[in-house]
Amino acid sequence: CRLVYRTGISVAPFKAQNMSNNAAVTRQGGEIGRAQALQAEACGIESHVDMNPILLKPDSDESAQVVMQGRVRGRSDASALFDRTSEFRRIAYESYSRLANRVDAIILEGAGSAAEVNLRHCDVANWPMVDYADASVLLVADIDRGGVFAQVLGTLDLLTLEERRRIIGVVINKFRGRRELFVEGTTFLEKRSGIPVLGVVPFLSGLRLDQEDSLDHGRQTVFSDSTVNVAVVLLPRMSNFTDFNALAAEPGVALCYADRPEHFAKADVVIIPG
Protein backbone atom coordinates (compact mmCIF):
# COMPACT_ATOMS: atom_id res chain seq x y z
CA CYS A 1 0.00 0.00 0.00
CA ARG A 2 2.68 2.48 1.00
CA LEU A 3 4.75 1.75 -2.09
CA VAL A 4 1.85 2.60 -4.41
CA TYR A 5 0.91 5.64 -2.32
CA ARG A 6 4.43 7.04 -2.70
CA THR A 7 4.07 7.01 -6.48
CA GLY A 8 1.23 9.51 -6.21
CA ILE A 9 -1.53 7.05 -7.12
CA SER A 10 -4.64 7.11 -4.94
CA VAL A 11 -4.87 3.64 -3.42
CA ALA A 12 -6.94 1.75 -0.87
CA PRO A 13 -6.63 -1.64 0.87
CA PHE A 14 -9.28 -4.34 0.61
CA LYS A 15 -9.80 -7.69 2.29
CA ALA A 16 -13.17 -9.25 1.53
CA GLN A 17 -13.30 -11.49 4.58
CA ASN A 18 -11.14 -11.34 7.66
CA MET A 19 -11.11 -13.40 10.85
CA SER A 20 -9.74 -11.57 13.85
CA ASN A 21 -10.70 -10.39 17.31
CA ASN A 22 -8.57 -7.29 16.82
CA ALA A 23 -10.89 -4.74 15.29
CA ALA A 24 -10.56 -1.05 14.50
CA VAL A 25 -13.42 1.44 14.52
CA THR A 26 -13.91 3.79 11.58
CA ARG A 27 -14.97 7.41 11.89
CA GLN A 28 -18.51 6.28 11.05
CA GLY A 29 -18.46 3.82 13.96
CA GLY A 30 -18.15 0.62 11.95
CA GLU A 31 -15.75 -2.22 12.73
CA ILE A 32 -13.07 -3.55 10.39
CA GLY A 33 -9.96 -5.66 10.85
CA ARG A 34 -7.05 -3.88 12.51
CA ALA A 35 -4.81 -4.72 9.55
CA GLN A 36 -7.03 -2.89 7.08
CA ALA A 37 -7.08 0.19 9.31
CA LEU A 38 -3.28 0.15 9.39
CA GLN A 39 -3.13 -0.34 5.63
CA ALA A 40 -5.48 2.61 5.13
CA GLU A 41 -3.07 4.73 7.15
CA ALA A 42 -0.27 3.57 4.85
CA CYS A 43 -2.43 4.68 1.90
CA GLY A 44 -2.87 8.13 3.43
CA ILE A 45 -6.65 7.80 3.69
CA GLU A 46 -9.25 7.26 6.39
CA SER A 47 -10.36 3.70 7.02
CA HIS A 48 -13.82 2.70 5.80
CA VAL A 49 -16.01 -0.36 6.32
CA ASP A 50 -15.84 -1.15 2.60
CA MET A 51 -12.16 -2.00 3.06
CA ASN A 52 -13.14 -5.10 5.06
CA PRO A 53 -16.81 -5.86 4.46
CA ILE A 54 -16.89 -9.22 6.27
CA LEU A 55 -15.22 -9.50 9.69
CA LEU A 56 -15.55 -12.74 11.64
CA LYS A 57 -14.70 -12.47 15.34
CA PRO A 58 -14.25 -15.97 16.84
CA ASP A 59 -15.95 -16.58 20.18
CA SER A 60 -15.17 -20.31 20.27
CA ASP A 61 -13.35 -22.90 18.18
CA GLU A 62 -16.50 -23.44 16.12
CA SER A 63 -18.41 -20.15 16.05
CA ALA A 64 -17.91 -16.44 15.43
CA GLN A 65 -19.64 -13.10 15.66
CA VAL A 66 -20.39 -11.82 12.16
CA VAL A 67 -19.70 -8.18 11.29
CA MET A 68 -20.94 -7.12 7.86
CA GLN A 69 -19.96 -3.74 6.44
CA GLY A 70 -19.10 -2.55 9.93
CA ARG A 71 -22.23 -3.71 11.78
CA VAL A 72 -22.75 -6.79 13.95
CA ARG A 73 -25.13 -9.22 12.25
CA GLY A 74 -25.43 -11.96 14.85
CA ARG A 75 -23.24 -15.02 15.21
CA SER A 76 -22.86 -18.25 13.28
CA ASP A 77 -21.26 -21.63 13.79
CA ALA A 78 -18.77 -22.93 11.25
CA SER A 79 -21.25 -24.86 9.10
CA ALA A 80 -23.64 -21.90 8.97
CA LEU A 81 -20.79 -19.64 7.86
CA PHE A 82 -20.13 -21.93 4.90
CA ASP A 83 -23.82 -21.78 4.01
CA ARG A 84 -23.57 -17.97 3.82
CA THR A 85 -20.83 -17.95 1.17
CA SER A 86 -23.05 -16.51 -1.56
CA GLU A 87 -24.27 -13.75 0.76
CA PHE A 88 -20.72 -12.91 1.85
CA ARG A 89 -19.50 -12.77 -1.74
CA ARG A 90 -22.35 -10.43 -2.71
CA ILE A 91 -21.54 -8.08 0.18
CA ALA A 92 -17.84 -8.18 -0.72
CA TYR A 93 -18.52 -7.35 -4.36
CA GLU A 94 -20.74 -4.41 -3.35
CA SER A 95 -18.06 -2.95 -1.08
CA TYR A 96 -15.29 -3.47 -3.63
CA SER A 97 -17.30 -1.72 -6.34
CA ARG A 98 -17.94 1.31 -4.15
CA LEU A 99 -14.30 1.48 -3.12
CA ALA A 100 -13.13 1.17 -6.73
CA ASN A 101 -15.10 4.30 -7.61
CA ARG A 102 -13.15 6.35 -5.06
CA VAL A 103 -9.52 5.45 -5.82
CA ASP A 104 -7.25 4.65 -8.76
CA ALA A 105 -5.92 1.36 -7.40
CA ILE A 106 -6.90 -1.24 -4.81
CA ILE A 107 -4.54 -3.67 -3.10
CA LEU A 108 -6.47 -6.91 -2.51
CA GLU A 109 -5.32 -9.10 0.35
CA GLY A 110 -6.25 -12.76 0.39
CA ALA A 111 -6.83 -14.95 3.44
CA GLY A 112 -4.89 -17.99 4.55
CA SER A 113 -3.26 -19.71 1.58
CA ALA A 114 -3.96 -19.14 -2.09
CA ALA A 115 -4.38 -22.91 -2.46
CA GLU A 116 -6.84 -24.02 0.23
CA VAL A 117 -8.18 -26.86 -1.92
CA ASN A 118 -10.67 -28.06 0.71
CA LEU A 119 -12.27 -24.61 0.96
CA ARG A 120 -12.66 -23.65 -2.70
CA HIS A 121 -16.43 -23.99 -2.50
CA CYS A 122 -16.68 -21.40 0.28
CA ASP A 123 -13.78 -19.11 -0.64
CA VAL A 124 -14.60 -15.42 -0.36
CA ALA A 125 -11.36 -13.47 0.01
CA ASN A 126 -9.11 -15.16 -2.54
CA TRP A 127 -9.96 -16.29 -6.06
CA PRO A 128 -13.58 -15.09 -6.22
CA MET A 129 -12.34 -11.55 -5.54
CA VAL A 130 -9.50 -11.93 -8.03
CA ASP A 131 -12.00 -12.94 -10.70
CA TYR A 132 -14.49 -10.21 -9.80
CA ALA A 133 -11.82 -7.49 -9.85
CA ASP A 134 -10.01 -9.02 -12.85
CA ALA A 135 -6.86 -8.59 -10.77
CA SER A 136 -3.26 -9.60 -11.32
CA VAL A 137 -1.77 -11.57 -8.43
CA LEU A 138 1.48 -11.34 -6.49
CA LEU A 139 2.31 -14.50 -4.54
CA VAL A 140 3.97 -13.42 -1.28
CA ALA A 141 5.93 -16.02 0.71
CA ASP A 142 7.18 -15.61 4.29
CA ILE A 143 10.76 -16.88 4.37
CA ASP A 144 11.08 -16.16 8.10
CA ARG A 145 8.88 -19.18 8.85
CA GLY A 146 11.09 -21.51 6.80
CA GLY A 147 10.21 -23.74 3.86
CA VAL A 148 9.81 -20.89 1.40
CA PHE A 149 10.58 -23.02 -1.67
CA ALA A 150 7.92 -25.54 -0.74
CA GLN A 151 5.51 -22.68 -0.01
CA VAL A 152 5.89 -21.16 -3.44
CA LEU A 153 6.18 -24.27 -5.60
CA GLY A 154 3.60 -26.24 -3.63
CA THR A 155 1.09 -23.42 -3.90
CA LEU A 156 1.63 -23.05 -7.63
CA ASP A 157 1.26 -26.79 -8.13
CA LEU A 158 -2.16 -26.79 -6.44
CA LEU A 159 -3.60 -23.90 -8.44
CA THR A 160 -5.76 -24.33 -11.51
CA LEU A 161 -4.27 -23.31 -14.84
CA GLU A 162 -6.45 -20.19 -14.95
CA GLU A 163 -5.44 -19.19 -11.40
CA ARG A 164 -1.77 -19.69 -12.17
CA ARG A 165 -2.05 -17.48 -15.25
CA ARG A 166 -3.15 -14.65 -12.97
CA ILE A 167 0.16 -14.67 -11.07
CA ILE A 168 2.57 -12.06 -12.41
CA GLY A 169 5.32 -12.51 -9.84
CA VAL A 170 6.59 -13.81 -6.52
CA VAL A 171 7.70 -11.69 -3.57
CA ILE A 172 9.85 -13.11 -0.78
CA ASN A 173 9.02 -11.41 2.52
CA LYS A 174 10.92 -11.06 5.82
CA PHE A 175 14.36 -12.04 4.55
CA ARG A 176 17.15 -11.88 7.14
CA GLY A 177 20.79 -11.43 6.22
CA ARG A 178 22.59 -10.37 3.07
CA ARG A 179 20.48 -10.23 -0.06
CA GLU A 180 23.17 -11.84 -2.22
CA LEU A 181 22.81 -15.05 -0.20
CA PHE A 182 19.42 -15.60 -1.83
CA VAL A 183 20.45 -15.09 -5.45
CA GLU A 184 20.66 -18.84 -5.99
CA GLY A 185 17.23 -19.25 -4.41
CA THR A 186 15.73 -16.62 -6.69
CA THR A 187 17.20 -18.32 -9.75
CA PHE A 188 15.90 -21.71 -8.64
CA LEU A 189 12.36 -20.44 -8.09
CA GLU A 190 12.26 -18.63 -11.42
CA LYS A 191 13.56 -21.62 -13.40
CA ARG A 192 11.32 -24.11 -11.60
CA SER A 193 8.13 -22.03 -11.75
CA GLY A 194 8.60 -19.88 -14.84
CA ILE A 195 7.42 -16.90 -12.78
CA PRO A 196 9.73 -13.98 -11.93
CA VAL A 197 10.74 -13.18 -8.36
CA LEU A 198 9.98 -9.46 -8.32
CA GLY A 199 11.47 -8.63 -4.95
CA VAL A 200 13.01 -9.78 -1.70
CA VAL A 201 11.76 -7.71 1.23
CA PRO A 202 14.11 -7.53 4.23
CA PHE A 203 12.98 -8.34 7.75
CA LEU A 204 12.58 -5.02 9.54
CA SER A 205 12.71 -5.17 13.32
CA GLY A 206 11.46 -2.46 15.62
CA LEU A 207 8.62 -1.29 13.38
CA ARG A 208 6.13 -1.49 16.27
CA LEU A 209 3.19 -2.04 13.96
CA ASP A 210 0.01 -3.48 15.44
CA GLN A 211 -0.34 -7.24 15.10
CA GLU A 212 -3.69 -8.59 13.96
CA ASP A 213 -3.64 -12.25 14.89
CA SER A 214 -0.52 -13.16 16.85
CA LEU A 215 0.20 -11.61 20.21
CA ASP A 216 3.43 -9.62 20.01
CA HIS A 217 5.37 -10.96 22.98
CA GLY A 218 8.22 -8.64 22.05
CA ARG A 219 6.19 -5.76 23.53
CA GLN A 220 6.50 -7.30 27.00
CA THR A 221 8.99 -5.92 29.49
CA VAL A 222 10.56 -7.33 32.64
CA PHE A 223 9.04 -6.44 36.02
CA SER A 224 11.30 -4.52 38.38
CA ASP A 225 11.10 -2.57 41.63
CA SER A 226 11.47 0.72 39.77
CA THR A 227 8.52 0.24 37.37
CA VAL A 228 4.77 0.10 37.61
CA ASN A 229 4.23 -3.58 36.88
CA VAL A 230 1.12 -4.43 34.86
CA ALA A 231 -0.05 -8.02 34.32
CA VAL A 232 -2.63 -8.66 31.60
CA VAL A 233 -4.50 -11.93 32.04
CA LEU A 234 -3.80 -14.01 28.94
CA LEU A 235 -7.31 -15.12 28.01
CA PRO A 236 -7.76 -17.58 25.10
CA ARG A 237 -9.79 -15.17 22.91
CA MET A 238 -8.61 -11.78 24.01
CA SER A 239 -9.81 -9.01 21.71
CA ASN A 240 -7.99 -5.82 20.76
CA PHE A 241 -4.81 -6.73 22.63
CA THR A 242 -3.01 -4.12 20.54
CA ASP A 243 -4.63 -1.54 22.83
CA PHE A 244 -1.96 -2.48 25.38
CA ASN A 245 0.91 -1.51 23.06
CA ALA A 246 0.78 2.14 24.10
CA LEU A 247 0.89 1.13 27.76
CA ALA A 248 3.85 -1.19 27.15
CA ALA A 249 5.73 1.68 25.47
CA GLU A 250 5.16 4.05 28.38
CA PRO A 251 8.37 4.93 30.30
CA GLY A 252 8.32 3.55 33.81
CA VAL A 253 5.79 0.83 32.98
CA ALA A 254 6.52 -2.89 32.65
CA LEU A 255 3.83 -5.06 31.06
CA CYS A 256 3.49 -8.81 30.69
CA TYR A 257 0.80 -11.24 29.57
CA ALA A 258 0.24 -13.71 32.39
CA ASP A 259 -1.30 -17.17 32.38
CA ARG A 260 0.11 -18.61 35.63
CA PRO A 261 -0.62 -17.56 39.23
CA GLU A 262 3.05 -16.92 39.96
CA HIS A 263 3.15 -14.34 37.16
CA PHE A 264 0.91 -12.06 39.22
CA ALA A 265 3.07 -12.07 42.35
CA LYS A 266 4.96 -8.86 41.53
CA ALA A 267 2.16 -7.12 39.65
CA ASP A 268 1.01 -3.70 40.84
CA VAL A 269 -1.93 -3.77 38.45
CA VAL A 270 -3.86 -6.71 37.01
CA ILE A 271 -5.97 -6.17 33.88
CA ILE A 272 -8.66 -8.61 32.75
CA PRO A 273 -9.12 -7.84 29.04
CA GLY A 274 -12.30 -8.16 27.02
Name each model-derived stretch:
Residues 1-274:
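Flexible phosphate-sensing "switch/lid" loops adjacent to ATP/NTP-binding sites
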